[in-house]
Curated annotation (Swiss-Prot):
This is Flagellar assembly factor FliW. HAMAP family: FliW. It is found in: Cytoplasm. Residues 127-154 are annotated as: Disordered. It holds the Pfam family FliW. Belongs to the FliW family. Interacts with translational regulator CsrA and flagellin(s). Its main location: cytoplasm. InterPro entries: Flagellar_assembly_factor_FliW, Flagellar_assmbl_FliW_dom_sf.
């Protein structure tokens, strides 16, 4: 599959390199296939690039790289589209917005990825996490995927 990305130029990807978001993302419900692209300049950041729209790419981070105590509190039904099994691990990412020096991340609506099945969903958490949590200016090391044991379903 060829993606003409505004940010990365032309990308050649196999279908197995894409994540399927059956419900799309909040505000982009019609966009279902996304590629996770590492940022060439910052190991703490990746980009979720739409396969259908070259002009749609979201900066994402592992929130635990910046907020080690971050936990996702959601209902079991919210994870049903990921088709998780008892051994599945969920990788949690949050979107980044703003400008250098004033970056924020959305801890209220994380992206959940089932790496084995290449499925994703965006959920709204059951707690009062901020939608615009300021990010520390110091670059953080990449965090490991958040195991399902650390995703608390209500």
């Amino acid at each position: 599959m060829r993606i003409d990305s505004h940010r990365f130029g032309t990308l050649e990807l196999n279908a197995d390199q894409l994540f399927l978001f059956p419900q799309g993302l909040i505000g982009m419900e019609s966009l279902h296939q996304w590629a996770l692209i590492p940022d060439p300049d910052n190991a703490s950041v990746a980009w979720l690039q739409s396969a259908a729209r070259g002009d749609r790419a979201l900066a994402v981070i592992s929130p635990r790289a910046f907020f080690p105590d971050y936990r996702v509190h959601i209902g079991r039904r919210d994870l049903s589209s990921l088709h998780l099994t008892s051994g599945s691990e969920v990788y949690v990412m949050t979107t980044v917005a703003g400008h250098v020096g004033k970056l924020t991340t959305n801890l209220r609506a994380p992206l959940m990825l089932n790496l084995d099945r290449r499925l994703g969903c965006q959920v709204i958490t059951n707690d009062d996490r901020p939608m615009r949590q300021p990010l520390p200016t110091v670059a953080a090391e990449s965090a490991k995927p958040l195991p399902t044991s650390q995703v608390r379903a209500a």
